[in-house]
Structure formats: structure tokens, C-alpha cells
């Protein structure tokens, strides 16, 4: 499957958005693009990794959207294309990410799976050349 630019951005809910910003930068190499505090409180932020982007906010039981650490289950994961899965895996492991599946070769490329500080699953893949 060729890598193409997407205009769909996952919106991920965290218990502590500033902590998630720091952790995703350190462990997964994301870059903070913006953060804002809406009038009703909480925080909204956006991050990028290359030309891929994610959004995040404070979880809210009122909206029925909370982190996996609070709900004890994840209902979605984030799939990210990378240039070098093995290098990324080493960085994530060194930063304390929970590695679910070590790097391995699959029909769709080289891939590994990790969980972030709130338990969201992340699937990192380098497509076949």
C-alpha cells in the first residue's frame, strides 16, 4: 500500500495533556505544533511526526471519551508510517514505552506495536520497499 497524505487526524483523549505532549515527544519523536485552553477548561493540542498529525484533548466522562487507563479498554489505535521502525522502536523502548510486539516483518512492511502512557495502542510500520 503506497503511503499517501491523509486528511484524517485521530483525536486522542488523555488524562493529562501536558504530560502526554512531553511523553510523545520523548518516546515517539512527535513535535508539538500547538496547544490551547478552551473556555470550558481542559486543553487541546496538536502534534506532528513528519507530515502525519494527531490531535489530543482532556478526556471527559461527560462526552463519554476517556483514556484507556480510566476505562480499562482501548477502542482504537493509531497507525503511523515511519522511515525506520527499528530505530523508532529503540527510542520508544529506551523512553519506557510498553512494547506490545517487537519489530517483525509482515506482508505490509516491518512493524511493531507499543502503548503510550495512557494505554493507547500505537502501530508503527515501515512499508516494504
Predicted regions and their residues:
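Conserved beta-strand-loop-alpha-helix junction that forms the acyl-donor binding cleft
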Residues: 15-16
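Vicinal oxygen chelate
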Residues: 1-11, 21-117, 124-129
Amino acid at each position: 500500500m503506497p503511503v499517501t497524505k491523509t486528511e484524517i487526524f485521530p483525536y486522542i483523549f488523555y488524562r493529562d495533556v501536558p504530560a502526554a505532549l512531553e511523553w510523545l515527544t520523548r518516546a515517539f519523536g512527535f513535535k508539538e505544533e500547538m496547544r490551547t485552553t478552551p473556555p470550558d477548561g481542559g486543553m487541546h493540542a496538536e502534534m506532528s511526526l513528519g507530515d502525519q498529525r494527531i490531535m489530543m484533548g482532556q478526556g471527559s466522562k461527560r462526552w463519554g471519551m476517556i483514556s484507556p487507563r480510566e476505562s480499562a479498554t482501548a477502542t482504537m489505535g493509531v497507525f503511523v508510517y515511519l522511515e525506520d521502525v527499528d530505530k523508532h522502536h529503540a527510542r520508544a523502548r529506551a523512553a519506557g514505552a510498553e512494547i506490545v510486539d517487537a519489530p517483525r516483518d509482515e506482508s505490509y512492511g516491518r512493524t511493531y506495536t507499543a502503548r503510550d502512557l495512557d494505554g493507547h495502542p500505537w502501530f508503527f510500520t515501515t512499508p516494504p520497499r
